[in-house]
Amino acid sequence: PTTQGSDALRQSIAGWIGRRYGVPAPDAATQVLPVNGSREALFAFAQTVVDRARPHAKVVCPNPFYQIYEGAALLAGAQPVYLNTVAHTGFAMEWAELPESTWREVQLVYVCSPGNPTGKVIRNELTRIAEAQP
């Protein structure tokens, strides 16, 4: 099969997403990409969203982290930026640790909830971060 899978498969996935989450189904031709696992997906996503033409591209990763985050960032031409997650903060990513100058260069943020390997569940803090960005 082709890398993108068959049209019937992508249509089926798009329909399931719409039914499962009660949202408009994504466009199967441009917004659905079947993958063989998370590793392939994370690499493909970084290759898609990191703009190599922009200087100083950065990708934010939790630390400790799934090593694929780092490899995908580097392969996409970006510099990984690590946010330490530690016990005294409940293993939460401390978003305020990133200076505004770094945020301006961030092109991708890898987040896993529940976190691996910490088990931290991200709730409303991620929505607040997303809404604060241009």
PLM regions with names:
Residues Q31, Q79-V81:
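Conserved beta-strand segments of alpha/beta enzyme cores
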Residues R10-K58:
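Phosphate-binding glycine-rich loop
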Residues P1-G15, P114:
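A structural motif shared across PLP-dependent enzymes of the aminotransferase-like
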Residues T85-P134:
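Active-site phosphate-binding strand-loop segment of PLP-dependent enzymes
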Residues Q4-A8, N36-G37, P64, E125:
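Short beta->alpha linker loops
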Residues N36-E40, A44-Q47, C61-Q79, A87:
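Substrate-binding/gating loop at the entrance of the active-site cleft, primarily
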